């Protein structure tokens, strides 16, 4: 009995088999991604697809400075408000920046017809030529062109008027009928602006135009309108009870525009030959101008990013990422990051891909850890790692390329009377934005799930590759590890890793060692059977002796009567 127990203990203590484990890389990364099934999965490597930073400045777009309107708005700039004089020399720009609460617009109160449409037209203009459509000194010889000034458009403390319009008044006690035409020979669209004055009383009408009833007619191929002044008392705005309504039209190349009036005409002085630039736009921003360059400008600031998505602002100008409402869009490129505690088991095995990854393997994503008499070490499987890197890199680049449709997205213009239309447009835009956000998030979730499954599959394939080579020359001991039935030196280990393991060479040694181990198992089973029988017999004898002693004691003190019948 003692000899058999000694054999078992010696067999267990002498076992120090060579092992090889399959596992994957782990590191100290704290990157987390979401998948379809899980949230906040820690991974070894990932790429961010969502830009959330900007510089807070207005920058040059592709080397061209923007037109910063400062204290002026579009109306003040294009009409020629004298307080916007510094802007008149600007001929080209990358985009137009307007502040939310600009002070200088229409200095003389009145209605600006189709103002939102004009803004929309100017948002696609990148430069223009400002020219005299009707020169001031020689176009109106029978009308006064200097007395049409007002305190509401004062400049440097003096009454003045718009720099692109002329207020024609009576001259020498009369206001003759006028007729003036312009033929567009600029070979591009020309923006023409004019106004109609509406006095507050008949006395002003007679004083300025020398007649009670007047009209203004403007005609071109695409425009035909006749205006009649509306004389009425009105509340004073900027000290004025009168009003000027402002109008505009786009004159096509070769077209003619004709002005006829017998009073109340605010005549064009300067017009604009427009050059369209579809990368331009108008943004409303409080950001300050800086000496910087960008490819994408938002009202919040410039974005310099090649990422496909951004969550900074929906209004963008230039080559910009698509705006989404997401707060996180991170795509996994590496593996699940679950570093294992590398503790030695009974046979010195390192925890494999089941418990977690290896921080000791730094030169690849998947690989091996071996242990034999010559030592132990990690080695990456370069082929499977490189194939995985190539596949995932191509996938990430493809996703970015497909989703990275960079473009300008400017806000639409609506006047105060079009509130219902603006609300409807906002709902439509919100719907499209929700769809874009959903599509972007779903794409990332699905691709993350596929990538992690792809890595799991690669580790499993590597495991099956080793298993198919070793066959019954080794046994699976869990944790992604195999224990050899034969001695496997470094050359042998290398052959397993590169797929050239010689199974027949080691099969005889493995067979003998398997039989020895199986014999030890049989011997140990015999020992366990003897111990079980001995334990059963001994327990039965103890039980019988105990029952006999109790019975004798009870009979001796009368507690139990014993009768023997013959």
Curated annotation (Swiss-Prot):
Any Gene Ontology CC annotation: viral envelope
Extracellular side: 18-529
Gene Ontology molecular function, alphabetical: host cell surface receptor binding
Post-translational modifications reported in the UniProt record: Palmitoylated.
Pfam families to which the protein is assigned, alphabetical: Hemagglutinin
Lipidated positions per record (S-palmitoyl cysteine): 555, 562, 565
Positions on the Cytoplasmic side per record topology: 551-566
Site (Cleavage): 344-345
Cysteine pairs bridged by disulfides in the record: 21-481, 59-292, 72-84, 107-153, 296-320, 488-492
Signal peptide limits: 1-17
Transmembrane segments: 530-550
InterPro entries per record: Capsid_hemagglutn, Hemagglutn_HA1_a/b_dom_sf, Hemagglutn_influenz_A, Hemagglutn_influenz_A/B
Family recorded in the similarity comment: Belongs to the influenza viruses hemagglutinin family.
Quaternary state and interactors: Homotrimer of disulfide-linked HA1-HA2. Interacts with human CACNA1C.
HAMAP family: INFV_HEMA
Further details from the record: Major glycoprotein, comprises over 80% of the envelope proteins present in virus particle.
Name this protein carries in UniProt: Hemagglutinin
Gene name of the encoded protein: HA
